[in-house]
């Protein structure tokens, strides 16, 4: 599979069977000049409703017709506000199988509200089985004990986790989460987008290397095979 990182928590995964876009944040994202209208994902996954994960949902929907997977409140909002009927509500612990893979919604310790301040439902992460690969996007979160269940139930190949601190866990919270999940590779998200999220990536890499975990820091716009 190929992963493209657009900065912050926005990334795309492409396999032979499907293209998945996560948490579309482009227009106000200082790390990318990508026009969301140029993307054509088959599936759009949204972890929660905060503006830095949701603000370009409408632009993506106008350009393509993806299946939207998210919590009940977000999928209802997408249907009612944008007139988009290709939705799959998926609350925490729920799962759905598709011909291209499997998606399960996981807990995330965070908050969620739409840009207008209305309730955005419960935030989530996602575990995805894509062929032989298992991907865990934690979503915006702090460490929580049930992360160990993810590690017990799946052999996670790639874990994507926030490291920017302040609004989510920082480097050492992400390391503690990694110790529970035991993935093959960790990719950092949610850093250096705004001044409160300035992150020492050398410290991130050093801490994980010392603990024996492989990491990969993507440049914004970078695509790599994983």
Swiss-Prot record:
InterPro entries according to UniProt: Metallo-B-lactamas, RibonucZ/Hydroxyglut_hydro, UPF0173, UPF0173_UPF0282_UlaG_hydrolase
Pfam entry (one): Lactamase_B_3
SS bond partners: none
Residues making up the signal peptide according to the UniProt record: none
GO molecular function: hydrolase activity
SMART domains recorded: Lactamase_B
Keywords noted in UniProt: Hydrolase
NCBIfam families, sorted: PRK00685.1
PANTHER family: UPF0173 METAL-DEPENDENT HYDROLASE MJ1163, UPF0173 METAL-DEPENDENT HYDROLASE MJ1163-RELATED
Family: Belongs to the UPF0173 family.
Protein's recorded name: UPF0173 metal-dependent hydrolase SRU_1937
């Amino acid at each position: 599979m190929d992963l493209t990182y657009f900065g912050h928590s926005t990334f795309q995964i492409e396999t032979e069977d499907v293209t998945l876009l996560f948490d579309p944040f482009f227009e106000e994202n200082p790390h990318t000049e990508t026009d969301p209208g140029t993307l054509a994902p088959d599936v759009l996954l949204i972890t929660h409703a905060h503006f830095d994960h949701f603000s370009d949902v409408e632009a993506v929907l106008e350009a393509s017709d993806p299946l939207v997977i998210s919590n009940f409140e977000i999928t209802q909002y997408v249907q009612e506000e944008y007139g988009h009927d290709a939705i799959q509500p998926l609350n925490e612990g729920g799962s759905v199988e598709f011909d291209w893979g499997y998606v399960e919604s996981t807990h995330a310790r965070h908050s969620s509200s739409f840009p207008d301040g209305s309730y955005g439902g419960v935030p989530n992460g996602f575990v995805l089985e894509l062929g032989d690969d298992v991907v865990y996007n934690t979503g915006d979160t702090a460490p929580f004990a049930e992360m160990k269940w993810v590690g017990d139930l799946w052999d996670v190949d790639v874990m994507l986790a926030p490291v920017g601190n302040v609004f989510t866990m920082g480097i050492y919270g992400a390391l503690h989460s990694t110790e529970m999940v035991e993935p093959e590779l960790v990719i950092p998200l949610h850093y250096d987008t705004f001044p409160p999220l300035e992150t020492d990536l050398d410290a991130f890499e050093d801490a994980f290397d010392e603990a024996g975990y492989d990491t990969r820091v993507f440049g914004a716009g970078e695509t790599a095979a994983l």
